Amino acid sequence: MNILVLSTISAHHTYFINKIDKLFKISQVIYETRSIEKDFETKSPFEDDEIEYEKKYYFNKTKEKIRDTIKVSVIDDVNNIKSIDLIKKDFDVVIVFGCGIISSHIIKMFNSKLINVHRGIARKYRGLDSDLWAIYNNDFINIGTTIHFIDERLDTGDILFEKNITFESSDKIYHLRSKTTDLAIEGVLEYLQNMDLGNLNKKKQIDIGKYFS
């Protein structure tokens, strides 16, 4: 199976990629570096705690790096010409986790091969930080992870995996991203295993959640 991952550089993305690669060899990773400038503060008050916790949780005393067997490219924007040249290969699956919105051109290039890791319950919360918006709305039963096909709308594609988080009394807010990432690993591995067996399960999103940013 020929697998491409489109992502950004961070501890939880690195851990995700390495875990997938252990069972299904990843051919290439393209990291996107662009960021959207805002005229207001976007850093969360617990971001530093989150980063520190994830480095310990995922890597402890080992080096935080992508496995040496994976080809890695770093570009500004996954939708630019350089990226499109890199991804013209015949990939069987393109996994999107953490980069910007994918252009309609790339969606059409890969048709039904693009899957998205959405750290939230997409049927209820679309867009960025869906898990935090669920908390804001006191909607604790709709915190989890969704794996879905990518279509030309945002987080509305057919669902391949959806699972809610199990919370422990000792959990902190900065543990949340690691929990949704662990579910992402479970969901993507389940999808790839089903794909290997020719037993693909998907369901349409009947409820289309509100978009948050």
Where are these regions (language model features)?
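One-carbon transfer enzymes
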Residues: 1-213
